[in-house]
């Protein structure tokens, strides 16, 4: 029997255009209101059937952490054991999204794995079933399963489609250092002393969208700068290059600047690369939909 051709999919980065921490649950999870869109920095995953029934994951570049702790492996294992799948899978993961950068790379890889294996193994799980499984693996996983720019509320499980987003040109910068999400939220909690941002901005975002650079905001940004001054340096450098607005994504350390003009964005990115060899600098347009929308 001829083996089916491998499935190859992209796993894009996400950017938080706004992020407000509006509370904390008794179990320690923080409640958020955040608008997320995609950006064309992406990992690539290849999936091939394994008739032996095993789950095999290889990563490029190689990682030192246990493969069993990788969200890709955990997603495959969750589907295989949860639904009695006899077939296995060989997964090749090529990483481009930095770790600990606030871009959701691990969550994106996880979501792509759930979507791909739902097809490869013929599970025919619904979007709601996949979202429930994804949320159990990570709070950011559902937004990547949703495959559209969205407002996320709660711990990330309540998703609403966003109106059309501006055709901004972005310069996305990672300073080459990582931050612990737990550490950033802990520092933020110490700064606000339990007085979280009042909820309520979400409806305005849904009604009017995110149209202006001054709407960019991240409640975690101050805490991240305190823990990692390089974040502040990146934000300042983007403003110096003429960005109309700047913001940190997620819990950091990646930041981005928005530009109305593509030429200005390209020039800014080039200057930042020349002046900061250790920074990852990428210019591109914000994406309203997942690059693999309709392929699953």
Swiss-Prot record:
ATP binds at residues 98-108. It catalyses: 4-CDP-2-C-methyl-D-erythritol + ATP = 4-CDP-2-C-methyl-D-erythritol 2-phosphate + ADP + H(+). It comes from the Bacteria. Coiled coil: none annotated. GO terms for molecular function: 4-(cytidine 5'-diphospho)-2-C-methyl-D-erythritol kinase activity; ATP binding. GO terms for biological process: isopentenyl diphosphate biosynthetic process, methylerythritol 4-phosphate pathway; terpenoid biosynthetic process. Pathway: Isoprenoid biosynthesis; isopentenyl diphosphate biosynthesis via DXP pathway; isopentenyl diphosphate from 1-deoxy-D-xylulose 5-phosphate: step 3/6. The keyword Acetylation does not apply. InterPro entries: GHMP_kinase_C_dom (IPR013750), GHMP_kinase_C_sf (IPR036554), GHMP_kinase_N_dom (IPR006204), IspE (IPR004424), Ribosomal_Su5_D2-typ_SF (IPR020568), Ribsml_uS5_D2-typ_fold_subgr (IPR014721). It is an enzyme of class 2 (transferase). Its EC number is 2.7.1.148. Keywords: ATP-binding, Isoprene biosynthesis, Kinase, Nucleotide-binding, Transferase. The active site is at 14, 140. NCBIfam families: ispE, PRK14608.1. Catalyzes the phosphorylation of the position 2 hydroxy group of 4-diphosphocytidyl-2C-methyl-D-erythritol. Belongs to the GHMP kinase family. IspE subfamily. HAMAP family: IspE. This is 4-diphosphocytidyl-2-C-methyl-D-erythritol kinase. The gene is ispE.
